[in-house]
Amino acid sequence: MPDLSAIVKAYDIRGVVGDQLDEPTARALGAATARLVAGDDPAPSAVVVGRDMRDSSPALAAAFADGVTGQGLDVVDIGLASTDMLYYASGTLDLPGAMFTASHNPAAYNGIKLCRAGAVPVGQDSGLATIRDEAGRFLDSGVPGVPSPGAVRTEDMLTGYARYLRGLVDLTSLDASPELTVVVDAGNGMGGHTVPTVFDGLNVRVVPLYFELDGNFPNHEANPLDPANLVDLQKRVVAEGADLGLAFDGDADRCFAVDDRGEAVSPSAITGLVAARELARAHAAGESDVAVIHNLITSRAVPELVAEHGGRAVRTRVGHSFIKQTMAETGAVFGGEHSAHYYFRDFWKADSGMLAALHLLAALGEHRAAAAGATVSGLMAGYDRYAASGEINSTVDDQAARVAEIEGVFGPRDGVELDRLDGLTVSLPDGSWFNLRASNTEPLLRLNVEAADDAAVRALVDEVLAVVRA
């Protein structure tokens, strides 16, 4: 019997199919989820279930649905979906949801992302631990049924999802500028299912790359955070003379960009761009004191840009639960992470890489309408202000001791500022900074460095790693 404690993570359920996650386990998790949400006020009548393109997803989703209906709730089966399409369904139908996906993990994996009605995330401290424990009891002793089981009905949400997203972004600039050529790498993931419908009717020529749905990922991992997985897109953008490249991860909730030169665009720069646009939209609606959330690993250009556009930047720890919690507390219009998760107040505070992509297209259309021959690289130059290292992992035996050593080295220096919001962040007088934080699951320290230029980044990385890896 699978060990549920091994597959129920902080924010989702994820494991190797067969060994850790099988149909009886999915059925027990469905029953436990139904029991949890039945206690909500108001109690939902159904649970929305969506799935990605992995070979194991149809059977696991069907078993989960069987567990839900066995507890008297209906299931709304939306079929193949991106994770943000599941959030759209949860929000518009005001129902809890379950998305079967393992995102960018290898083909052997699958998982479940859960939310309550209105796309409110379910994590360990908000119901996932309860689901884990109850599902474990069901696996031990059987799942009790109810006299009147629920039913399954199917619903197509793709067209409504596309229409809703396009309604959140002013895309009229695309019609006022020459047709854009955009290469889209779906990585054989769900972007291949959603992009054609979302982009339909826009003044954009899409060059599709790996749109065939294939959960075995025959071309590359569906994880654009790894630079190796952007290489094909970068080459194709240059070969096509394209204006822009977009890359989606497996469940298409994250979107990365490549500019007209084939260079990767920093997610921090996209955060700054979208923040400026969402602030302008909020101000046009008469709002004041508008907040934007960013985690502490994003570039310091983000709070600078937020301030320049009349907003209030709020800094959080790394992790989507902190972003969503802070968005709820502040009423923030937008939130961004260095990992290319982008959260929108008008999208139930949930993340949507597709919505960020539409903002980027609209901004480029406006840029080109204002200046013939304008490019993404030119557009993003104002948002990508500093050099960054990316995340560098080091295996260490004693994480706390190494962090203390770093504090001892840098803390006494004149003009140095330290903070411990998440790990240790050290800000130097010249404006450079680094964050060192421990992994929660592995004996790793994660280092992120930002400075004025690449040479300064390399020098600071070398200085920190000389202590961390000594």
Describe every region a protein language model picked out.
Residues 1-64, 70-71, 151-180:
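An N-terminal, well-structured beta->alpha segment
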Residues 39, 43-110, 166, 197-258:
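N-terminal small/polar loop signature for handling phosphorylated ligands or for N-terminal nucleophile
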Residues 42-52, 76, 181-183, 290-296, ...:
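Short glycine-rich phosphate-binding loop at a beta-alpha junction
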Residues 97-109, 114, 237-259, 263-264, ...:
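Glycine-rich phosphate-binding loop
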Residues 110-240:
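Gly/Ser/Thr-enriched, mixed-charge loops and adjacent short helices
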Residues 203, 208-210, 263-282, 353-362:
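Gly/Ser/Thr-rich active-site loops/lids in small-molecule metabolic enzymes
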Residues 284-470:
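Phosphate-binding and adjacent anionic-ligand microenvironments
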